[in-house]
């Protein structure tokens, strides 16, 4: 029987999630897109009709400027994005998906569907709403830095 201490359960949950995300990421060909790169690809796809700048990705993912810079470099190296001059103001650089990035966004969708199905398949809407409220309170507690 697993430990019922909430902190121990969270640690176990995080470990198990990391393992499942890794396994399903490999199965769907998105092992390096299961984290921030994947979220950035989806954000770019959802905003293809707009100019998206590095600062927009930083804000959306709630990560620091240096982390965003490294993320952009990795994504460029992996061929998922290009950083090109803005069409409005050439001084600014916008981030656009490459054809590979667009194709991988579909794989990310399939991965997200699979992971959501595995996690939430036999949990009722009511249970999800209750757990959502509990997680919201936990997040609020963690975000309150005193």
What are these language model-derived features?
Residues 11-14, 41, 98, 132, ...:
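Generic structural concept
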Residues 1-31, 78:
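N-terminal leader segment of winged-helix/HTH proteins
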Residues 22-64:
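N-terminal helix-turn-helix DNA-binding core of bacterial DNA-binding proteins
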Residues 10-13, 17, 21-24, 61, ...:
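Alpha-helical linker/hinge and terminal dimerization helices associated
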Residues 54, 72-73:
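Short, hydrophobic-biased segments on the C-terminal half of alpha helices
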Residues 1, 125-146:
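C-terminal regulatory/oligomerization modules of transcriptional regulators
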Residues 73-132:
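Charged, amphipathic alpha-helical coiled-coil/dimerization segments
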